[in-house]
Amino acid sequence: MHLVAGDSPGSGPHLPATAFIIPASSATLGLPSSALDVSCFPREPIHVGAPEQVAGCEPVSATVLPQLSAGPASSSTSTVRLLEWTEAAAPPPGGGLRFRISEYKPLNMAGVEQPPSPELRQEGVTEYEDGGAPAGDGEAGPQQAEDHPQNPPEDPNQDPPEDDSTCQCQACGPHQAAGPDLGSSNDGCPQLFQERSVIVENSSGSTSASELLKPMKKRKRREYQSPSEEESEPEAMEKQEEGKDPEGQPTASTPESEEWSSSQPATGEKKECWSWESYLEEQKAITAPVSLFQDSQAVTHNKNGFKLGMKLEGIDPQHPSMYFILTVAEVCGYRLRLHFDGYSECHDFWVNANSPDIHPAGWFEKTGHKLQPPKGYKEEEFSWSQYLRSTRAQAAPKHLFVSQSHSPPPLGFQVGMKLEAVDRMNPSLVCVASVTDVVDSRFLVHFDNWDDTYDYWCDPSSPYIHPVGWCQKQGKPLTPPQDYPDPDNFCWEKYLEETGASAVPTWAFKVRPPHSFLVNMKLEAVDRRNPALIRVASVEDVEDHRIKIHFDGWSHGYDFWIDADHPDIHPAGWCSKTGHPLQPPLGPREPSSASPGGCPPLSYRSLPHTRTSKYSFHHRKCPTPGCDGSGHVTGKFTAHHCLSGCPLAERNQSRLKAELSDSEASARKKNLSGFSPRKKPRHHGRIGRPPKYRKIPQEDFQTLTPDVVHQSLFMSALSAHPDRSLSVCWEQHCKLLPGVAGISASTVAKWTIDEVFGFVQTLTGCEDQARLFKDEARIVRVTHVSGKTLVWTVAQLGDLVCSDHLQEGKGILETGVHSLLCSLPTHLLAKLSFASDSQY
C-alpha cells in the first residue's frame, strides 16, 4: 500500500513505504492451496501521483494481501519470513517502517527505521520453543492474550523515573530517552530481545498466520537437584504456577539465575558475585604486589596445554628421589591433578603446569635416572612405546614442560658432596646431608643414613642449606648421621675421610634476601587440607623466608607456615586470569552446610545425582561451616558427608593420609624395586634429633588393667557404650540366646577352660572349633611364651570370637576370653601390648 502524508494530493511525489498487513486469521482470506515462496511475489510497482479520492476527501489506500498458504505443503513458508528480523526490530523489505516484538505485545509498529546505537547491538539470537500466549496484530485488539496484560506490572520496589522523558530498562538498568521510535525502554533493550525471539517453524494445516507470531516463553533450564528435592512433573508445574506474581506474570529473573552453575548449591540459592575489588574496599586492605612473587607463582603467558589422559614422568612428593609414571587425571585452570599409574587415587597430587617436578616421557632414559614402572610391570621390561600402545594413551608433548628449558646446573654442587642442611620437618635441627641428584638448576638434599622421605629439592640460594662447618661457627649443634659410632665426637674432617667424599665449596652457596611480604597482605593460596581448592588468604605472620597463611573467614586453627617462594601461593587475581575457581572468604553470616537440602556440589564439574538413588546417607551434608563436601581427610575420596571425613574439621587436624591407607601404601612400597628402606637400630646418645621411624610406646604397663585390654580388643559390637559394665553386655547377649537366660555373667566369668570348651561344643555342635579354643587358651597360660607367639595366640582367639559360626554365642565367648585374660600375670599383659605395637 502507499502511505499518503496528507489529504491533499500535492504536486510532488510522495516517498513510498511498503508494509504488510497480517490478518488475524487466514481463514478469512482466499488463500491458494499451492505453496508459494514469499520472495517470489513481485513487489507492487510504485505509482507516483495522487492517490484515489473518495467522498469526504479521505485518502483510500489500496490493500495488498500477500498470498499465504496454510496447507500442509507450505512447510517452508511462514509469515515470519515476510519481515527481516535484524536485532530488536524487523523492517519490511525496502520500507522504513519497523515492527518490534515487545514483552507484552507480540507485534507492534515501532516507527520509522533508525540505525540502532552501537551499545544496543548484540550478536546472536536465542531460539525459544513454542508454547506462548495467543498473539494479536500490531494494534491491541481482542486477540490480546488473557494472561498477558496490556501494560507491564508496576514494581513497587522500583524507583519511578526522574521525569517523563526518561525511563529505565527493567533488565539492563540504564536510562534512555523515551520516544516513538524506541517505544519503551524495555522494547529497545537487546537483552530482553534476545530473551523474546521467535523461531520459524513449519506451519500445519490448522496453523493460522497469527499463531505463527506468538511470543515464546523462554523455558527456564531446570536446575539439577538431589533426588530428595526432585518432584514429579505435576508438582513441578504447580510450583511453576506459584512462582508467578498475582497478575499472572512470572517473577523477575536474570540470565544468571536461569543458567545452571555447578558451583551453586542444589537448593537453587544464588550467591552474590565476589570480586577482589569490592572485597579489598570493604576490608580496607591491600594485596601483595606481584613483584614479591617468583615467576613460578605469578601469572604466566603460556596456556595450560595438558589434556586429560596424557602420560608423563614426575617426582613422587612423598619420595622426592623417585620418578614415577603419571597420568593427567584433572585439569583445572593452570593446575593439574596427577595420578600414579597402577595405584589408588588416594596418592594423587596437584601441581602447577609449569612445575619443574614433571618431565616428558623418556626423560629418565636421556638423563640416566631410574623410573619406577607402573604396578604390575617389571623395570627391565618396561618400554614407553609399548606402554602407550597397550594403554592407548598419549604422551604429553615436550613443549608443555618448563623443565625443557635446559637451565645450567648449579656451580659447585655435584652428586656425593657433603653439606649441612636443615631438616624441613624439624626446622630446629641441622643435620649432615649429601647431594644425591642434580637436575637443571636444582639439586636433591639427602640426609645421610635416613630414608628418602625427608629429602627435598632446592637451589644454591636456599636458606635451608649451609656449608660444612656452619654449625660450629654459629654455635649450634649438628646432628650426625644415623648409626654414627661416636655421635658426641663427630668431626667433619674424619667423616669426609671415612666416606671419601668432599664438601661443597663455600663460594657455591648463594645468599637469598628476605622477602618483602607484610602482615595483612592479601593473596591466593592452595588449601593444604583440600589441595583442589584455592582460597582467599592473608599474611598472618612473617619470618625472613617464610610467611604464615590465614584463610579469610576461617579459624586460625587452619593457619600454616609456608615458604615465600612456594608454588602454592599466588598474587590476587591469579585464579581469574588462569581460569581456576577461587573460594571466597567464609562470611560471618554464611549458613552452615548442614542446612536442609540435597547433596552438596562436590566440585565445579559435579553432575546431578540420579533420581533412583536409594542411599539416604549420601544426601547428608558436612556440618562444618563453609565446607561444600569436597575432599576427604584421608585423601582417598573426592567427597565426604560427615564430620569424620571433613578435611576442614578442627578435630581432624592431626590425622594423616597414611594412617588410613597403610595397606595401599605398603603394597606400593613393596613394588618399588629400587627402594628398600634400611633397618635402623635405635641410636642412643645422639643430639636432639627425633627418630624418623615409629617409636615403640613406652607406657607404664602396670596401668594396663584387664578391663582396659578387654574393652580395647574384645568389647562386643552390640554394646554401644563401651564404658558399661560387663553384666549389662551379658544381658544384651542373653536376648540372643534364650537357652542361657538363667546363667549370670558372674558365673561365666568364673568358668574354666574346660567349661568354655563344653559351651562352645554345645553351641556350635562342632568339636574341632571347641578344641581349637581349648588348645589356644592353654597356650596362653604358658608363662614363658614369647611376645610374638602371645600376639599370634590372642589373634587366633580373636578370629575364633569373630567366627561366623559363633556369632550367636559371641558374648559368652568374649566373656570367657575376658576371664582368661584376667587370669594372666601382669608381665604377660605387658608382653601382649609390647608385641602388638612391635608387630603392627
Curated annotation (Swiss-Prot):
Gene3D superfamilies: 2.30.30.140, 4.10.320.30. GO terms for biological process: chromatin organization; constitutive heterochromatin formation; hemopoiesis; heterochromatin formation; negative regulation of DNA-templated transcription; regulation of cell cycle; regulation of megakaryocyte differentiation; regulation of mitotic nuclear division. Residues 127-269, 580-605, 657-697 are annotated as: Disordered. Changing residue 316 to N: Does not affect binding to monomethylated and dimethylated peptides. Signal peptide: none annotated. Residues 677-695 have a biased composition (Basic residues). Ubiquitinated in a VCP/p97-dependent way following DNA damage, leading to its removal from DNA damage sites, promoting accessibility of H4K20me2 mark for DNA repair protein TP53BP1, which is then recruited to DNA damage sites. The record marks 423 as: Mediates recognition of monomethylated and dimethylated peptides. Zn(2+) binds at residues 622, 627, 640, 646. Its main location: nucleus. One of its GO terms (cellular component) is condensed chromosome. Changing residue 551 to A: Does not affect binding to monomethylated and dimethylated peptides. Residues 447-454 are annotated as: Interaction with monomethylated and dimethylated peptides. Widely expressed. Expression is reduced in colorectal cancer cell line SW480 and promyelocytic leukemia cell line HL-60. Residues 156-165 have a biased composition (Acidic residues). MBT repeats lie at residues 274-374, 382-481, 490-585. The L3MBTL1 locus is imprinted. Paternal inherited gene is expressed, while the maternal inherited gene is silenced. Polycomb group (PcG) protein that specifically recognizes and binds mono- and dimethyllysine residues on target proteins, thereby acting as a 'reader' of a network of post-translational modifications. PcG proteins maintain the transcriptionally repressive state of genes: acts as a chromatin compaction factor by recognizing and binding mono- and dimethylated histone H1b/H1-4 at 'Lys-26' (H1bK26me1 and H1bK26me2) and histone H4 at 'Lys-20' (H4K20me1 and H4K20me2), leading to condense chromatin and repress transcription. The MBT repeat 2 specifically recognizes and binds monomethylated and dimethylated proteins. In contrast, it does not bind trimethylated proteins. The MBT repeat 1 does not bind methylated peptides but inserts a proline ring in a Pro-Ser-Ser/Thr sequence context. This is Lethal(3)malignant brain tumor-like protein 1. The lineage of its organism: Eukaryota, Metazoa, Chordata, Craniata, Vertebrata. The gene is L3MBTL1.
